[in-house]
Amino acid sequence: MSSDVRVHTWPCSYYLDLEKQWLPGKLTLTPRSLKFSVDKAEEVLVGLPLSSITEIRKETSLFIFSAITVLEKGQAKHWFSSLRPSRNVVFNIIEHFWRELLLSQPGTAANPTSPMTRGQELMGLMASSQRRMEDTAKVLHHQGEQLDSVMRGLEKMESDLDVADRLLTELETPSWWPFSAKFWKTPVEAKPRDSVSVAPCEPFGKEGVVIRVPAVVSQRTESHSKPGKLTVLVSGLEIHDSSSLLLHRFEKEDVDDIKVHSPYEVSIRQRFIGKPDVAYRLISAKMPEVIPILEVQFSKKIELLEDALVLRSRGRASPAEGGCSIRHAASRLMGCTTHQELPTGGQEGQQSQLQKDWPLLSEGEAQELTQILSKLKGLALDTEAELERQDAALDGITVAVDRATLTVDKHNRRMRKLL
């Protein structure tokens, strides 16, 4: 995700120590920096990398006006006041992204200039693919559980229809018929059914948790935002506060729409008739990991707004690029350009020479990549098997529904004759 993506912008004032005055402008937060620009000039006056910030505090200027102070490395202190909608809202969001950046890069403070090796970048790419595959597999298995539940419901319905058939037969039998009671004692003959054996699916985790991320939560208005957590379950969504107290649970079928305002901000709404809607707005540094999962679970209810279209543009690729994206990514990580080609003569010798000149992966990185690829292969095979099982289950459900519909129509005609 690009570090230039704007997370949020707030009107505020910045204290310029050289001129001893407050300058009105806008405070802009990106995933990796904090910037202040003056209103009139519209130029960035102050730019602070989040990794260089050592402390963020709530203070007051002249003992009256609320402000936020940012302490930078080298003991430089920056004052921001007149924050809207409120100081607490701005503080919670900035502190959230600052903490998440520090937690995600534990070695940055110790050695900020050390670049990632090609092997580390490639492992990060493969690990991200593995997480996406695991999340998709969880959602797919939950879908399989729902199909199993539908199949069990249809089997129970057919059993009830068999009982209704015996009752109707009893009612249709003349009162003088001496063997009318035998219908209650004669075992029902097994009917040939094209049912599909359905293997039970084990739930993932105690509550089927797909992903849980820290977030800044606000309900209805931004002025009441506070730290919390967003939990994506296979059956819905849960929002907790910082004390792990449940604020609201959205069942999967109760969610009416999800709007993605930016790669880091989403809003979730449940509509009601005759009372206010339930709506929550969430901002999180980990939201780019959550949005693809929401797109899978709520594909017909999610909407990407203008500032979030960068997610869709990143996901688009030409067919040629999509077919060999891993190879192109590996080539890029190896430092090769897409236009470099080896001549036909002596190709094997030049390849061996390139391997000697460019040490790509260490032995440990190669072993870890092998393990990740093995896991990806296993996940892909499991996903394929689950999809085939669900296709067969859908065929069985279709047959069972058609059979139940015909039986219900037949019973309705028999009941009308009795009336």
UniProtKB/Swiss-Prot annotation:
A Gene Ontology molecular function term of the record: SNAP receptor activity
Record keywords, A-Z: Coiled coil, Cytoplasm, Membrane, Repeat
Gene3D superfamilies linked to this entry: 1.20.5.110, Pleckstrin-homology domain (PH domain)/Phosphotyrosine-binding domain (PTB) (2.30.29.30)
Gene Ontology biological process terms from the UniProt entry: exocytic insertion of neurotransmitter receptor to postsynaptic membrane; exocytosis; long-term synaptic potentiation; synaptic vesicle fusion to presynaptic active zone membrane; synaptic vesicle priming; vesicle-mediated transport in synapse
Family: Belongs to the SVAP1 family.
Described purpose of this protein according to its UniProt entry: May play a role in intracellular membrane fusion.
UniProt protein name: Synaptosomal-associated protein 47
